[in-house]
Amino acid sequence: MAYQGSGSHSPPHYDDNGHRLQDLPHGSYEEEASRGLLSHQQGPFTGPFDDPQQHGSSTTRPVSGYSLSETYAPEAAYHDPYTQPSPGSVYSAQSAENPAAAFGVPGRVASPYARSDTSSTEAWRQRQAPGGGPGGLRRYATRKVKLVQGSVLSVDYPVPSAIQNAIQAKYRNDLEGGSEEFTHMRYTAATCDPNEFTLHNGYNLRPAMYNRHTELLIAITYYNEDKTLTSRTLHGVMQNIRDIVNLKKSEFWNKGGPAWQKIVVCLVFDGIDPCDKDTLDVLATIGVYQDGVMKRDVDGKETVAHIFEYTTQLSVTPNQQLIRPTDDGPSTLPPVQMMFCLKQKNSKKINSHRWLFNAFGRILNPEVCILLDAGTKPGPKSLLSLWEAFYNDKDLGGACGEIHAMLGKGWKNLINPLVAAQNFEYKISNILDKPLESSFGYVSVLPGAFSAYRFRAIMGRPLEQYFHGDHTLSKQLGKKGIEGMNIFKKNMFLAEDRILCFELVAKAGSKWHLTYVKASKAETDVPEGAPEFISQRRRWLNGSFAAGIYSLMHFGRMYKSGHNIVRMFFLHIQMLYNIFSTVLTWFSLASYWLTTTVIMDLVGTPSDNNGNKAFPFGKTATPIINTIVKYVYLGFLLLQFILALGNRPKGSKFSYLASFVVFGIIQVYVVIDALYLVVRAFSGSAPMDFTTDQGVGEFLKSFFSSSGAGIIIIALAATFGLYFVASFMYLDPWHMFTSFPAYMCVQSSYINILNVYAFSNWHDVSWGTKGSDKADALPSAKTTKDEGKEVVIEEIDKPQADIDSQFEATVKRALTPYVPPVEKEEKTLEDSYKSFRTRLVTFWIFSNAFLAVCITSDGVDKFGFTNSATDRTQRFFQALLWSNAVVALFRFIGACWFLGKTGLMCCFARR
């Protein structure tokens, strides 16, 4: 809920003017996301659970009265939509300019900082030094921290007072005496491989330390998303956890302890270098991260992952509003157990999942793991719906929900044809493809951006095969790892989620199946530009094709599973369906060209079947235009191979954009021709090749044996007609009106541009890791032995007041409105060279092709040539022979001249 402060608890420079607490109705996600939450007591602590000293902090720490009492974001004032806004609820001009002025935080000019190459990164590096902060380096007292088993560094750090104060007293009262769950953040420097992160080696996690059963482990994998995308996912997850905690009649969640203690959220960041440092400020604001605590190595042994743990009730919305609890209403967020794993180096998503499953999963032993990508926002009760599918089906091994494109406010993103086409593609996949595969029991792909697995179902061979794609295991696995794979297998692991799905269903001795949960929905952002779209689909298409072939080749392993005869029967049907689909995909390039030419010839070439008429430009102009369209189609198709074999999509942005436009125009032209064909067929204005006056039986027989317009009508009805019918059956038809036209325009580009680029770059598997120099900013941990001969390290001991003052600056940075970075459109020197090469090769090929077509093709006779192709070929051949003869004669004359000149010079040369 959002609240601007009230009564005596407000900062002195605010006038509340009777502003009251706004209770949000349960489930009003959009309203809640637009409100900032800002109310808590200030000044001295009012109870024993408000004082951090009561929870194990150092007794020498002075009491801080700091609390989260305002939103730091400008323009954050909330206006009640049902009442007139009161003057006191709106910030003064001074507050709007510098909302943190009440806490002594200087104003900061917003700048388009982002990701890993600008000033925010440099500032982050400076804050990692011991004692580093807004005031520069300081010298603090130190404390000695004993290492677990003499090698594992695991330290508890006090969280800022404001974060402690945000936890509701009823949760703190329920904790065991001496617990530091809400008062301290736990940091562990993991200097081992994920497989070695075990209790035996001294590593542990808080939920296991508190002897809690983990039913649901929610994982968010992250690469370099900005703080808005990350907040969108994290806030959506916390709202979903609230849905679960608020269940009143649950037979499961309300037994054996509070529901929130059975849920763990794990964020896995793939490397310090690509990570957006502003996102770390958001995590620090909710208490799950702190600057200056990470260690680059422990006694020279490099840290592989930095693990933070904290249980928080705070959240930050995508528009940088701080949400915290104020009452016991249904809209209040419950405590959420969070783990934040920041890998030191970028080592790809499969390695992130290895940390999740092999390291954290084996310690927590969850029943269900839900996987999300940063930027994917789960809808209301989506995670609950996914979990319920597992709870109600003991043989369910994996599930996924519906992913739809993020359309923006008022569906404004649909103005972009690429976004609209992808929206239609996602919708039809969720209406036709996923339900079909779910009926068979084998969903070929559970998207990594939004899916769930039963942990014990994927343990063993499924995860073992899945992790063969982790390049950090290449030396350990040898020939079975990435280094020993051929190019086909490497492409297969570009769609690693498909491998996991197949291995799960084919698991020996088990009868796990996969399903699609329609009630579970999530939205994700999709590429809006042609280069990004092409690059994304290159990985998807190559990976899915290779993984599909893999599943067909290894289908025999299904016989070792525990599926019953009915399930096996349907799995065989699905296998035949997949084979048929693969064949159609393989020949799609030729199929699209033939479909285009056949339809244009049926309506554009005058014949007895169409009454010697031609549509749409008349029988004289239409054949000429159709011929031009065919040559343009083939020309741009050839261009795709030239571009794909030598250029990056970002380096040929204009060429690809032009290709999308040209193929879109041709597609519209063909659709108009097809509709005209259908209209003529049913209007009776043209003879058809099926009978309508000899009964239903004869009609169906002639209709389905049709070889002309009838078969085209069948194809149109079987695709477009079914799209409409199925969409209305699922009560979700809007994409047919908002996105279907755009999809029709882009449909041919899916084949002619995306498939060509993907297959032409089959060699690009992008397995290399990026270098990481950001870890150099982290300090090292050196151990010593104390008087008791125990291995310890010396760690700084910050006063609570300094922790709070540094936190003020952190919150200010986190809640500063996000400014998207300005992407540089400049081409690299290599891109410029490749572009020139592409233009040169394109001009050379097309000019030669143009000459060959003009000479040999009968189709150009329509352009007014007075002679036939045979005559033109004969004359060209004559001209070519004469030209070669003239050139040879010219060369001979030159040789004779040189020989004569040399002879004369020999006669008169001085010796």
Curated annotation (Swiss-Prot):
Q: Where is the composition biased (Polar residues)?
A: 54-66
Spell out the GO cellular component terms annotated for this protein, sorted alphabetically and separated by semicolons: cell periphery; cell septum; plasma membrane
Sorted keywords for this record are:
Cell membrane, Cell wall biogenesis/degradation, Glycosyltransferase, Membrane, Transferase, Transmembrane, Transmembrane helix
- Would I find Glycosyltransferase among this entry's keywords? yes
BP GO annotations: cell wall organization; chitin biosynthetic process; conidium formation; hyphal growth
Q: Where is the composition biased (Basic and acidic residues)?
A: 12-34
Q: What does this protein do?
A: Polymerizes chitin, a structural polymer of the cell wall and septum, by transferring the sugar moiety of UDP-GlcNAc to the non-reducing end of the growing chitin polymer.
Protein name in UniProt: Chitin synthase G
